[in-house]
């Protein structure tokens, strides 16, 4: 059964009396976030290891182990390919809004896939909020450590459900 994610934003009152939308990132903040993420590329894996208190590898393995075998998989926010490089078999699509991340991820992931005899992954520049894929086109959709960076979480979740086949798996890892 499919359920549409409500589009009603969650707003919290600030000390100054204004409101903060906890589910959306403003334009200036989004641009700054992209610049900061791009700057982390050389140390991205190390930053994730520290931010997850050393649990990043375990969490990635846990997600990989729960994916359907030889599925059609979309990873939203692939970053430099840290998760995707170890995904075996199937059709793999890696989406990221930052071209520099894709430039790092593509050779890293496809080198690993080629060495295993897996088909090359497809890399797409884009965001969770506007997925450039047909409805019901993936067996699984995952987002590891990028959900916090989606500029409109409700819209991104709706889009994820739209491209997911009925009965498919949606997995989001977002450390608190």
Language-model features: locations:
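N-terminal auxiliary segments of SAM/dcSAM-dependent transferases
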Residues: 2-32
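Class I SAM-dependent methyltransferase Rossmann-like catalytic core
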Residues: 41-53
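Conserved alpha-helix/loop element of class I SAM-dependent methyltransferases that forms part
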Residues: 52-70
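Class I SAM-dependent methyltransferase SAM/SAH-binding core
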Residues: 74-130
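A short acidic, Gly/Pro-enriched loop at the edge of an enzyme's catalytic core
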Residues: 129-141
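A short SAM/SAH-binding and catalytic strip from SAM-dependent methyltransferases
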Residues: 140-152
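A short glycine-rich, Lys/Arg-flanked "PGG" loop and its adjoining helix->strand segment in the class I
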Residues: 154-166
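Conserved beta-strand signature within the Rossmann-like core of class I S-adenosyl-L-methionine
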Residues: 168-175
């Amino acid at each position: 059964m499919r359920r549409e994610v409500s589009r009603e934003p969650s707003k919290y009152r600030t000390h100054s009396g204004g409101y903060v939308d906890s589910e959306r990132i403003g334009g200036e903040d989004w641009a700054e976030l992209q610049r900061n993420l791009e700057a982390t590329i050389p140390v991205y894996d190390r930053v994730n290891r520290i931010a997850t208190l050393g649990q990043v590898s375990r969490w990635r393995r846990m997600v990989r182990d729960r994916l359907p075998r030889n599925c059609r998989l979309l990873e939203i926010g692939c970053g430099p390919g840290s998760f995707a490089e170890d995904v075996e078999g199937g059709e793999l699509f890696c989406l990221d809004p930052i071209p520099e991340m894709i430039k790092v991820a593509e050779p890293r992931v496809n080198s690993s896939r080629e060495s295993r005899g897996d088909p090359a992954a497809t890399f797409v520049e884009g965001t969770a909020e506007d997925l450039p894929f047909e409805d019901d086109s993936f067996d699984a959709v995952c987002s590891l450590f990028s959900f916090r960076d989606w500029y409109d979480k409700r819209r991104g979740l709706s889009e994820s459900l739209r491209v997911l086949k009925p009965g498919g798996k949606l997995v989001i890892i977002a450390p608190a």
